[in-house]
């Protein structure tokens, strides 16, 4: 219980939450940096451009947890991308992959998910814990300072 309280105390600092959420959102891009077979400049741009946009978005709110929830669509896509990187090794999300989600029967889905258990567990640990920290950030009275 003492260790859990220490972790909670760390995430009461809104600046740490800010940097943690940026790291969570850019994680799939960093993973694709190592798996994609494109030129180095394209892979660097694949990290720097989204990171700049996420950073800009997070500066719009004094509580990073609010912006994390506003960016939930990107959190969902990031989680999906990590599972696909585990499954295929490379390639970003394609439209037909979303169509396959709706047309696959339950037996095939169960078999596929059992093979993806490590990736799904990683996504749950990273992004669900991020959602919990986002709620704690919103409920926290401390805000990001304007000088930050």
Task: Go through each PLM region and give its residues.
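Transmembrane and membrane-interface helices of multi-pass
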Residues: 2-148
